[in-house]
């Protein structure tokens, strides 16, 4: 099967076969990252603009390297140094990029739905690199890829997503992707950081970490978004660490071959203990490598075979 | 577009004999197996390369390294194709440095696949020499590329299609010429 969408805005609504196509395409891409010459000519002459309205190290660099490894021309725009500060609207910025012949716009925005709005107004293909607390589809895909690589499958696994689900776009993309692929999803965190609507999506919700970890195959630890914790949603960081921090002792409740993920950047000693983050059963660095492979796969699938008249 | 069988070019025995002859030619041209390696172009080049490896093993008593090359990422027509090709793994589990590499494919036509394969190989390592072995050369080259070893030369028209079938992929061995019918 071929990629049939103009844009990649979220994992919600993607079919199982579409997710499988991306994951299968990412495997040979990962080989390229491991070579001495990390470059293939696949996207020569194509242009990719990374339009970032929020700070990012790994996602932006990952997209930029993915494009460069495939010989595309990549340009980074940080909103702070663009015409956004002069009051230009998102749609006008998009139209400007369109007029310059941009093939793909990778956008990160603090407002949920911003990539959807942009996609409606530009000819360029749009990839959501994180919108507010909505979705972060490429992070979700790299998490799925990492789990499948380590466990050999996704179907039938129990995955516990631990921490600040309320503010997490990573959690939402994980939930949609994992459920589509047939995994059982558990959410765990302080009740103030668990959005009630997620309980109706078919996931199990826990407020006691011990119960959430019981027999889990995978634990995906979310970053405690300290910059968003001024609303008093939990008393102190110390108390959070004591109640919900993942440590070796708590991990004993999981399956013996448990896999630990973290989208980074980590608050060591808060949501995850040092000796957990650096253990062999954690794949945190591997997630970063896999992120480049998955993004290469997405760029390939979005740009290859455009003669098919791909649709929204 | 339909394809109608026109003639059988090679049966299983003919393919086996062609592989045997090419194996001898490879050994003769390279004066043995020192630094020799075989790399098949996916898909049908890979089983043909494997058969060449087995034949060389039979003749020389030594196994030469075998790799598989996927050239999808090196094609120059990706964004104009209607159907997106699926990418498979490239597996070259040995160093190409200093090797005499024999690239193996089923059909040589425009030469674009071989050009892509040459680019792909050179990105993986720096062989001493690259040679080309094909089961069928049907002509119509669009690039200055020539095979070193050919199982069978078949002059064709552009409205004809050469179909090579191998046991490992298609469940039978054979090569036939087909007509494109609108």
Curated annotation (Swiss-Prot), chain A:
Binding site for carbamoyl phosphate: 58-59, 108, 136, 139, 264-265
Single GO biological process annotation from the record: 'de novo' UMP biosynthetic process
Keyword Transferase: yes
InterPro entries (alphabetical): Asp/Orn_carbamoyltranf_P-bd, Asp/Orn_carbamoylTrfase, Asp/Orn_carbamoylTrfase_sf, Asp_carbamoyltransf, Asp_carbamoyltransf_Asp/Orn-bd
Pfam family membership, one: OTCace
Keyword Ion transport set for record: no
This protein's pathway: Pyrimidine metabolism; UMP biosynthesis via de novo pathway; (S)-dihydroorotate from bicarbonate: step 2/3
Residues at which L-aspartate binds: 86, 169, 223
Function per UniProt: Catalyzes the condensation of carbamoyl phosphate and aspartate to form carbamoyl aspartate and inorganic phosphate, the committed step in the de novo pyrimidine nucleotide biosynthesis pathway.
Subunit-level organization: Heterododecamer (2C3:3R2) of six catalytic PyrB chains organized as two trimers (C3), and six regulatory PyrI chains organized as three dimers (R2).
Recorded family membership: Belongs to the aspartate/ornithine carbamoyltransferase superfamily. ATCase family.
Name the record gives this protein: Aspartate carbamoyltransferase catalytic subunit
Organism for this UniProt entry: Heliobacterium modesticaldum (strain ATCC 51547 / Ice1)
